């Protein structure tokens, strides 16, 4: 059954809400808790003088004294109020106070009241009976039949605890014994019963929970959802605070149609660096449509991200993600990847950095999710060297880049290769108040040692290939300020830029194999996506295996408007085009060369016409195809961090996709509209709704609706979603055959006075197409 979610209907419900209060939720919650009055005293409380006030006193010096009628005792931060107090003293060290009837006790950390108590004035301990307590300056209250308090620990018998405000019994924890560790800011409870609205719903022989800002180990709140593909799913995360600099979360999840999944995540910050190690594992996926004829039904994900700086100038970076199969991110939601990425990256880089040079060794591999006969190359090792010297030539800046790389492919049809590259550059910059002129010369010198693929059907290769290509570039930029205001109140500048690049032609068809042109040319080159800023790039292709000839002039300019009072930029508009004095090509094939004398027109603009409104637009017109090739625009209203509305449109022509991907299974234009609303309706209620629709297919891509309800001590999130998913095995897979996964879920969160967020930011991160901001003016 197809489910539709109306963003408009959700937004209209906001009209029925009024502002809950002027103060935010945190301020409202803290209004309901007591705060310490007066100046907080530091030091040993037992050594401070004792002040006693009472209506009546019977003193039997030096042994005891009895005080009655509005008795008040103060020592340091501690205050005690009672109907009757008897103080006994045995020498200078032992002083005890016994309270009869009702009492109130308070210090800088806790307030308590009840009947009958005893307090040792020389050791900061107190014995309380039938007490009710409330933490000072933060949420947290409870009761106990008896309690023993000292300077760093509270031991409570038959106790209860809740972070809810007075008169709110949404949830509570009861136990036979509770120990509150004051310095460590956590509580332990034995034979714990968790209650919701007074009804017991969960039992644990032992439980820990925070009573401060420090993180503590223990069970986190479970969440569940239902999916048309997975069935019912239940997750129970466990948090392990291993040390101040490392922790872990272990989350077992049960899918009614798939089985059990275990997801550990370990985070660390040590002298050896900081990072995260995570995994997701299902021993046997029971879903019938997944590999029905394959006994290997394991599904897993491995992720490691690491950053390290050590010794002097050394850095290590690791980003490794591997999944069991191409469909993994289509079947499972994971924060370590998405099906829209198209691939998972496995890479590392070890580098040594100095002010005028750096040296690094790295490796990279891509795990693609598309069905490709030949995948991308893996690179190991890749050694890069960069050297900078602005004194080698008078008036010139010298730069040298050198690289050695080894390429291998999983396909036996594909060649292997070593690539040796040297790239010296000499730049002569001239600049004054009128603008800048850069004259640059560069030389690309590359040598390949190629090995034919091991398959008999592999193409023959030139074993040794040497390519030397010189380059000359002249770049002129200036900033012109208008004498008169075109629009009142706004100053205007125009920034023209002209660039000339020359590179001679070199046939590079003998570098690599043409079998993998669906993903790259040669070993690691691909046609770069074009926009206004890319017009001024030196090259059309990434990597080093394809360097097209160039005899071209690129001209463009940016018009900017600034508020004359604040100097803040409010509008810009850029337009540019490349003019080919001769065709740009990489080999003798006509499809790999330019046939027109000019490139696409590229336009880009940003407009912040109000502090709450942003608009962005980009447009490209392909003069070769005589059609619009790319276009996108978005409009956003954002009055605050937790309130925004964004409308967007994206377009890519079929011919442009064919030109860049070469294996375009989509077969038609991409025309996609989207709308995202994230809104804090009140301090307690927030929602997020999003919808993306493909106009060309006339079908939805993804729809989401999520509502968050927040209180001082708990929050709940309810969401529904419908998104495109991978084609089930054995099902038709044409352009009109789309398959969806429908989800419904509920998440709860207990709040112990440390989190008051509306949940809008978190909700916006959900989904196959996450919310992004692409505005050039903030």
UniProtKB/Swiss-Prot annotation:
Keywords: Cell outer membrane, Membrane, Signal. GO terms for biological process: Gram-negative-bacterium-type cell outer membrane assembly; lipopolysaccharide transport. InterPro entries: LipoPS_assembly_LptD, LptD, LptD_C, OstA-like_N. It comes from the Bacteria. The keyword Cell inner membrane does not apply. GO terms for cellular component: cell outer membrane; transporter complex. The keyword Signal applies. It is found in: Cell outer membrane. It holds the Pfam family LptD_N. Residues 1-23 form the signal peptide. Its main location: membrane. HAMAP family: LPS_assembly_LptD. Belongs to the LptD family. Together with LptE, is involved in the assembly of lipopolysaccharide (LPS) at the surface of the outer membrane. Component of the lipopolysaccharide transport and assembly complex. Interacts with LptE and LptA. This is LPS-assembly protein LptD. It comes from Actinobacillus pleuropneumoniae serotype 5b (strain L20).
